Structure formats: structure tokens, C-alpha cells
């Protein structure tokens, strides 16, 4: 009986996790040549007002890039230079643009949102 209860609790937690709203990011992966422009799109949770971009270079820690609120950059890191830009063009998607990619831009990019 105890084993059944534990299995039921785990299943319930997994099921609850699947129904939570989530942030969607496209494309899921991008391969490009150096010097090309890349646009990464993020669809945040609908009622969220704050948006964030992070990146993680292979073998390194996750780095904060920029936060965005009320259609303006609210905070940015030192690595967020003129090569990068963010915008929320249609009021729902939140984009990160890398104007001219360099080898050191090779990384996993993550978006997030909060209320």
C-alpha cells in the first residue's frame, strides 16, 4: 500500500508539472556561419512583465546577458555590447539578435520571464 501511495504521489507531481505554463524558445538550435545575423525568439508566459536572456558557453557557468521591462532594457551585463539587441516587436515574442556572430558567441542561449 505504501509503494502504491508513493507512485501515485510521484505521478501526480509529474502531471502537475506538465500542466504549468512554460516559456517557449525558437529555434531550438541554430547553426550559422561567422559574420551572420541570428535572431532567437522567446514566447514568455502571457502575464509576465520581465524578460531575461542568459547564455552558457560549453564548460562554463551560465551568464546573465540582459533583462527587459516595459519595452526597455532594465539591466545588461558587460558582455551585452552593440553586437546584441533585444526587442518585443509584437507584444508577445521577446527576441535576442546577434548582429554579426563570432566564434565566442557559440553557446546555449536561454530566455526566461517573471511577473
From Swiss-Prot:
Signal peptide: 1-19
Residues the record marks as carrying a glycan: 93
Residue ranges constituting the Ig-like domain according to the UniProt record: 21-115
InterPro entries reported for this sequence: Ig-like_dom (IPR007110), Ig-like_dom_sf (IPR036179), Ig-like_fold (IPR013783), Ig_V-set (IPR013106), TCR_beta_variable (IPR050413)
Alphabetically ordered keywords of this record: Adaptive immunity, Cell membrane, Disulfide bond, Glycoprotein, Immunity, Immunoglobulin domain, Membrane, Receptor, Signal, T cell receptor
GO cellular component entries: plasma membrane; T cell receptor complex
Subcellular location: Cell membrane
Disulfide bonds: 42-111
A GO biological process held by the record: adaptive immune response
Subcellular location, principal: membrane
Subunit structure: Alpha-beta TR is a heterodimer composed of an alpha and beta chain; disulfide-linked. The alpha-beta TR is associated with the transmembrane signaling CD3 coreceptor proteins to form the TR-CD3 (TcR or TCR). The assembly of alpha-beta TR heterodimers with CD3 occurs in the endoplasmic reticulum where a single alpha-beta TR heterodimer associates with one CD3D-CD3E heterodimer, one CD3G-CD3E heterodimer and one CD247 homodimer forming a stable octameric structure. CD3D-CD3E and CD3G-CD3E heterodimers preferentially associate with TR alpha and TR beta chains, respectively.
UniProt cross-references to PANTHER family, sorted A to Z: T CELL RECEPTOR BETA VARIABLE 2, T-CELL RECEPTOR BETA CHAIN
Function in brief: V region of the variable domain of T cell receptor (TR) beta chain that participates in the antigen recognition. Alpha-beta T cell receptors are antigen specific receptors which are essential to the immune response and are present on the cell surface of T lymphocytes. Recognize peptide-major histocompatibility (MH) (pMH) complexes that are displayed by antigen presenting cells (APC), a prerequisite for efficient T cell adaptive immunity against pathogens.
Annotated protein name in UniProt: T cell receptor beta variable 2
Gene (UniProt): TRBV2
